[in-house]
Amino acid sequence: MATDIATRDLRKPIDVAEYLFRRLREVGVRAVHGVPGDYNLVALDYLPKCDLHWVGNCNELNAGYAADGYARINGMSALVTTFGVGELSALNAIAGAYSEFVPIVHIVGQPHTKSQKDGMLLHHTLGNGDFNVFTRMSADISCTLGCLNSTHEVATLIDNAIRECWIRSRPVYISLPTDMVTKKIEGERLDTPLDLSLPPNDPEKEDYVVDVVLKYLHAAKKPVILVDACAIRHRVLDEVHEFVEKSGLPTFVAPMGKGAVDETHKNYGGVYAGTGSNPGVREQVESSDLILSIGAIKSDFNTTGFSYRIGQLNTIDFHSTYVRVRYSEYPDINMKGVLQKIVQRMGNLNVGPVSPPSNLLPDNEKASTEQAITHAWLWPTVGQWLKEKDVVITETGTANFGIWDTRFPAGVTAISQVLWGSIGYSVGACQGAALAAKEQGRRTVLFVGDGSFQLTLQEVSTMIRNNLNPIIFVICNEGYTIERYIHGWEAVYNDIQPWDFLNIPVAFGAKDKYKGYKVTTRDELRELFANEEFASAPCLQLVELHMPRDDCPASLKLTAESAAERNKSL
């Protein structure tokens, strides 16, 4: 077994935990989410010294969701849990972050290395002496593991994990045994900031791919740009915006790409999701002779049940690790460098005018005297109320699909979990996002269904504790609407117990730091949206938004029907 480095040989000795937390602060992390446990307590003592804020969540699952939301606004996040019981509680959230390319550094406090070596029968174990079993469980949902068991390699493992987390935009796992927390290592390397730059593409290969792309782009008569989630996750939005601006091409987003493009831009055409799209959007995208697809994730909920009608022969796919031109794939090529060179070398394109975007109310909704708040009326109306640079979070279900019809002001960030789709995610994510947004002076708005809210609403307590002021709309429609449309319309398992949502923040100790509203008609919601004090978000606000039980966005209905058919036929 390797011996520890003698402290006297270190030029700038520093404790392992301090090194780890200082690196996290260096890359922009300002708050750490998690739940304390006896194997991580001493490590948590280092947070104040490293100028990191401890959030302290109600449970590890919610903490994981919160870390996800924080990372989507801040760029990266950190989560601390304890061995076994704590880390396993967070795994659903970590899996979602892995699925959706969200960079979280998951730090797990572990028992003393000698206890592990001796196979002691400790609490939080399976009782079989295997102390690596939980690490193995995390391996498939982490892009790298950093097991800090020896001072000789600790700094390298920490630096590598943080860099991989950033570059690959996925969670990493760092185990920190109790005896390693206070061990001394060389701190001199902290004087050199981590290199978080992407590995450069091979210049010759990159130039060849750019030439191929430009050949098809200049030959196309009706090219369009389609932007999706991985353009956001892999940080190519500057390149995308420059491409959109310089090319003048009609530009659309997939549902997971909402917010990736300035929706007030003259080139912006709307959300393309196959059969769930606005008819004009669908016609323009599907009649195009060249789709420049940037960061696509073609999942079922992102495509209205795999209903894309665009062929690969007319598509160029840009991704973080490859570019695919029609049926030819070019591996080990990052889209960032390729997009930069395309913009530099593109020149003028021969394209026609872009159709003006529209998310106006449907004619039947404009003429309606109905007072019930329907999805067809709600979501375009929300777009008229939102502010520039808002952070808008939507829960899996009606909100996730309804937001497709909301036209965002400039600079709005959208957060949802379309691929992983864990109900309840949005509440924890709202806490994390609101914390990061507060640091940026931005407003946070959450739309969550009543069923999903019941899973994770403890994090409203954490919002109150951290003086966060999100505006929370709870869509009250008597249960799991998305699941009713898939199967079991009248089934009791899709029902929920009605809760008095407006009094929950009071039970959590909000007192004078909270305002609640109950809205049942369109006029009441119009009045609330016109209330300047409400819009200024002076404190945490919760709105019970009552909607018909059987109403849902048309895109959700189509997707649910597709899911039901697959469940029966596969």
From Swiss-Prot:
Its EC number is 4.1.1.1. The keyword Lipid metabolism does not apply. Mg(2+) binds at D450, N477, G479. The keyword Lyase applies. GO terms for cellular component: cytosol; nucleus. Keywords: Decarboxylase, Lyase, Magnesium, Metal-binding, Thiamine pyrophosphate. One of its GO terms (molecular function) is magnesium ion binding. This is Pyruvate decarboxylase.
